[in-house]
């Protein structure tokens, strides 16, 4: 059996706002409440479970999403409409740029708790696969 990611917890300063921000930005269905979590289903049977950091400092994480060219255009348009800062690199040095790694496009931006979100149209290391 192949191992698949099923869900991960995304600690947030305001999980309700963070889950709705994420779902809206990515064009996904509204979050569903499940116990203390606000779940956003991202596809491929994977769920992001937004949870309050409980007053503790949120440890910033990186979440990368492989999207189609059309999805990239749609998500990136929402990033721009919301006037979010974006970068071509995870070090946030190339502001306002899009990377072109492996013949695709990629961009990084932050969510409401500071997590670094990334959308890419080609998986890294994808030469010869696309």
Give the positions of each predicted feature:
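Core segments of cupin and vicinal oxygen chelate
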Residues: 2, 9-48, 52-54
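Short aromatic/hydrophobic contact patches that present stacked aromatics
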Residues: 7-9, 39, 62-64, 106-108
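Short, charged/polar surface micro-motifs in flexible loops or helix N-caps
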Residues: 44-47, 56-57, 68-73
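Conserved beta-strand in the GNAT
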Residues: 48-51, 108, 117-120
